[in-house]
Amino acid sequence: MPKLKTRKAALKRYKKTGAGNFLRRHAYKGHLLMKKSNAQKRKLSQRVCVSSGDSKPIKLMLPY
Protein backbone atom coordinates (compact mmCIF):
# COMPACT_ATOMS: atom_id res chain seq x y z
CA MET A 1 0.00 0.00 0.00
CA PRO A 2 1.46 3.42 -0.91
CA LYS A 3 2.23 6.03 1.69
CA LEU A 4 -0.32 8.74 2.40
CA LYS A 5 0.69 12.15 1.11
CA THR A 6 0.71 15.22 3.29
CA ARG A 7 -1.02 18.35 1.99
CA LYS A 8 1.82 20.87 2.04
CA ALA A 9 -0.51 23.88 2.25
CA ALA A 10 -2.03 22.51 5.46
CA LEU A 11 1.42 21.67 6.82
CA LYS A 12 2.44 25.33 6.51
CA ARG A 13 -0.72 26.61 8.23
CA TYR A 14 -1.29 24.22 11.14
CA LYS A 15 0.88 22.79 13.90
CA LYS A 16 -0.04 19.63 15.77
CA THR A 17 0.14 19.67 19.56
CA GLY A 18 1.01 16.77 21.82
CA ALA A 19 -2.63 16.23 22.72
CA GLY A 20 -3.59 15.87 19.04
CA ASN A 21 -5.11 19.32 18.63
CA PHE A 22 -4.05 21.79 15.96
CA LEU A 23 -2.84 25.36 16.35
CA ARG A 24 -3.49 28.07 13.79
CA ARG A 25 -2.65 31.73 13.37
CA HIS A 26 -5.17 34.55 13.48
CA ALA A 27 -6.34 36.35 10.36
CA TYR A 28 -6.14 40.14 9.84
CA LYS A 29 -2.44 40.35 10.73
CA GLY A 30 -0.91 40.65 7.25
CA HIS A 31 -1.38 44.28 6.23
CA LEU A 32 -3.35 47.45 7.05
CA LEU A 33 -1.89 47.34 10.55
CA MET A 34 -1.55 51.09 11.18
CA LYS A 35 -5.22 51.48 12.04
CA LYS A 36 -5.18 48.57 14.50
CA SER A 37 -4.23 49.15 18.12
CA ASN A 38 -1.18 47.56 19.70
CA ALA A 39 -3.39 45.43 21.94
CA GLN A 40 -5.30 44.12 18.94
CA LYS A 41 -2.11 43.32 17.03
CA ARG A 42 -0.66 41.60 20.08
CA LYS A 43 -3.80 39.49 20.47
CA LEU A 44 -3.76 38.57 16.78
CA SER A 45 -0.15 37.40 17.09
CA GLN A 46 -1.07 34.59 19.47
CA ARG A 47 -1.87 31.14 18.19
CA VAL A 48 -5.25 29.60 18.88
CA CYS A 49 -6.58 26.03 18.82
CA VAL A 50 -8.66 24.93 15.86
CA SER A 51 -12.26 24.12 16.76
CA SER A 52 -13.23 20.48 16.99
CA GLY A 53 -15.48 20.64 13.93
CA ASP A 54 -12.67 21.95 11.75
CA SER A 55 -10.01 19.57 13.03
CA LYS A 56 -11.36 16.44 11.32
CA PRO A 57 -10.53 17.57 7.74
CA ILE A 58 -7.14 18.79 8.95
CA LYS A 59 -6.39 15.33 10.35
CA LEU A 60 -7.09 13.89 6.91
CA MET A 61 -4.75 16.41 5.27
CA LEU A 62 -1.97 15.80 7.82
CA PRO A 63 -1.81 12.03 8.32
CA TYR A 64 1.57 12.01 10.09
UniProtKB/Swiss-Prot annotation:
One GO BP: translation
Pfam hit, one: Ribosomal_L35p
An example molecular function term from Gene Ontology annotations: structural constituent of ribosome
PROSITE patterns xref list: RIBOSOMAL_L35
Entries under Gene3D superfamilies matching the protein: 4.10.410.60
UniProt keyword list: Chloroplast, Plastid, Ribonucleoprotein, Ribosomal protein
InterPro entries recorded: Ribosomal_bL35, Ribosomal_bL35-like, Ribosomal_bL35_CS, Ribosomal_bL35_sf
Top-level taxonomic group: Eukaryota
One Gene Ontology cellular component annotation held by this UniProt entry: large ribosomal subunit
Localization (cell): Plastid, Chloroplast
UniProt KW Ribonucleoprotein keyword: yes
Similarity field: Belongs to the bacterial ribosomal protein bL35 family.
NCBIfam families in UniProt: rpmI_bact
Protein name: Large ribosomal subunit protein bL35c
Organism name: Thalassiosira pseudonana
